[in-house]
Amino acid sequence: IREESDLFADRHEALRLDYAFTEFFLVSSIYYYYLQQRQEAIISIDNIQEDEALSDTNQLLYYHYLKGSASLVAANTPEERKLREFDELYFTWRTAVKSKHPYFEGNGMQGLANLMASPSNFEFFKTRRTHALDQFDFPVDSLFPLRLAQLALEKFREYNDLYQIAGAYVSIGKYLNAHGRYQ
């Protein structure tokens, strides 16, 4: 289909085709991820042409959220991979706030909370991404990941998405377990 996509003379039809291709590759990468086929998921998401992903805000946010939350990023070291995951999720959160997309605002916060649930990971990001963490309206202390997960829960309640609400509770539980505070 891509080989003959230049046959779409109408700009609106060409944009719709770009949207469909982007959606196809986003969904494909999710399926590969859930099948634990990480390389295939990366290949699928890398098939998305940046200008196509950037043309629709929802797709842009989903693209960056998937890359960060599913670890569909290229990196040479585990530390570099964690930083890239963080950057993708932070971009998702920041862009969602600016564009008023509460669903992705919550997803970005929940993804960041999951990355920082363990004390060692929190310290890692606290030293390497201080400027980003300072953008949130609460102290950057050991409770920071818990607060992020709780804010994500609030967003998902506003959005009334039961699946995401359950995921936020999992993130809160993950933090509490990692800190020996779960009873």
Give, region by region, the residue ranges found by the protein language model.
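Residue register of alpha-helical TPR repeats
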Residues: 23, 62-64, 69, 107, ...
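Residue signature of alpha-solenoid helical repeat architecture, marking inter-repeat boundaries
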Residues: 19, 58-60, 103, 143, ...
